[in-house]
From Swiss-Prot:
Keywords: Cleavage on pair of basic residues, Disulfide bond, Hydrolase, Metal-binding, Metalloprotease, Protease, Secreted, Signal, Virulence, Zinc, Zymogen. Zn(2+) binds at H300, H304, D315. This is Neutral protease 2 homolog AFUA_4G13750. SUPFAM superfamilies: Metalloproteases ('zincins'), catalytic domain. One of its GO terms (cellular component) is extracellular region. Pfam families: Peptidase_M35 (PF02102). The keyword Metal-binding applies. Disulfide bonds join C178-C250, C257-C275. Belongs to the peptidase M35 family. It is an enzyme of class 3 (hydrolase).
Length: 370
């Protein structure tokens, strides 16, 4: 993994997955075609109670996030936008939407801005997942959502004319090495992420089956092997601070950080970026179960990158309650499920020799440990 910094600043969600009470609020999403690849989503609160939820990583988010999944001949079209990890408390008011019972809101977006649809032809669009609900600007639960399946015929020429939401960076300019306190913090986070991922890999492959079932909703050997393999791949990537398969920015190269975003990944470029609150808000390692910290945030972002382990994960759910309500197939591809499992898997104590070298290490840069 190369560490750099800018010099200037699915459809089966419900089937067999959930045992929700009949009166549980839900969001119904109706997708319609506006013009070619431009889509309108109408989101309705079908419950009997007012709900306040986080609309970031959802409809009404102005950033190029994954609002829907696109399929051509049953194969998902690669998403070229960003996937980001959000705060779970202290959220700003502009990150929240409140819907009364029966109320709706609409969001229009162009799917060709975050996917290559220049081939044209038939594309199927759908979405499902969970949206975090909040109390006093803190995530307190989740609300499920699901859409209709929309089939559109894409005009290839029109799709090609849609500007891409994210332009590739010119890596020849405005790029320098991490330095100072952020370099030190990220170096520590990478070491901790590698340690947590290694411990989680062992727990996934040969640890408690009850605990694995809690997070991944199955104890099948194939799933345990897949989860362990992804954790080992994350540990390997986090252990290499001067080379690797991803590029890690200490700050935001694209301008998609805000007061609610800890970090984000651009899977199509295997690029990860930390936001300001990654450093100011998160501890290096939390002592609380299922809480956020720098190490598990970095681990979460690594799971999104397909070059680390393919396919990269999605964000079907955030937090323990929502993540443990997923189906087995969704949990296997949910980034926060990996972060939560790793958070609850304490790494083995380091050997005395390792501690000795750490005490002697005064380098704040990115040279390898002895």
């Amino acid at each position: 993994m190369k560490v750099t910094i800018l010099a200037s600043a699915i459809l089966a969600l419900i089937n067999g997955a959930l045992a929700l009470p009949a009166n549980t609020p839900t969001l119904d999403v109706t997708l319609t075609q506006v013009d070619n690849t431009r889509i309108k989503a109408t989101v309705k609160n079908t419950g009997n109670e007012k709900v306040t939820f986080v609309h970031l990583n959802f409809f009404q988010d102005a950033a190029p996030v994954k609002k829907v999944s696109l399929f051509r001949n049953a194969t998902e079209v690669e998403f070229t936008g960003i996937k980001r990890r959000l705060l779970t408390e202290g959220l700003s008011d502009d990150a929240l939407t409140t819907l009364a019972p029966g109320a709706t809101f609409e969001d229009e977006f162009d799917v060709a801005s975050t996917a290559d649809l220049t081939e044209g032809g038939t594309v199927t669009i759908r979405t499902d997942g969970f949206v975090p609900i909040t109390t006093d600007r803190k995530v307190s639960g989740y609300i499920p959502y699901q859409s209709n399946e929309l089939e559109i015929e894409v005009d290839a020429a029109k799709a090609a004319a849609v500007p891409q939401a994210i332009k590739l960076l010119d890596r020849r300019t405005k790029v320098a090495s991490c330095s100072g306190s952020r370099a030190s913090a990220l170096s520590t986070a990478l070491r901790n992420a590698a340690s947590l991922a290694n411990a989680a890999a062992s727990a996934a492959s040969s640890g408690s089956s009850t605990r694995f079932q809690e997070y991944f909703k199955t104890t099948s050997s194939s799933t345990r092997n897949t989860v362990a393999a992804r954790f080992r791949a994350v540990a390997s990537e986090a252990s290499s601070q001067s080379s690797g398969k991803t590029t890690y920015y200490c700050t935001d190269p694209y301008g998609y950080c805000d007061s609610n975003t800890l970090a984000y990944t651009l899977p199509s470029s295997n690029l990860i970026a930390n936001c300001d609150i990654y450093y100011s808000y998160l501890p290096a390692l939390t002592s609380s179960c299922h809480a956020q910290d720098q190490a598990t945030t970095t681990l979460h972002e690594f799971t999104h990158a397909p070059a680390v382990y393919s396919p990269g994960t999605d964000d079907y759910a955030y937090g323990y309650r929502a993540s443990t309500a997923l189906s087995a197939s969704q949990a296997l591809l949910n980034a926060d499920t990996y972060a939560l499992f790793a958070n609850g898997t304490p790494p083995p104590p380091p050997s005395p020799l390792h501690i000795h070298f750490q005490m002697l290490d005064t380098n704040n840069g990115y040279s390898r440990e002895p």
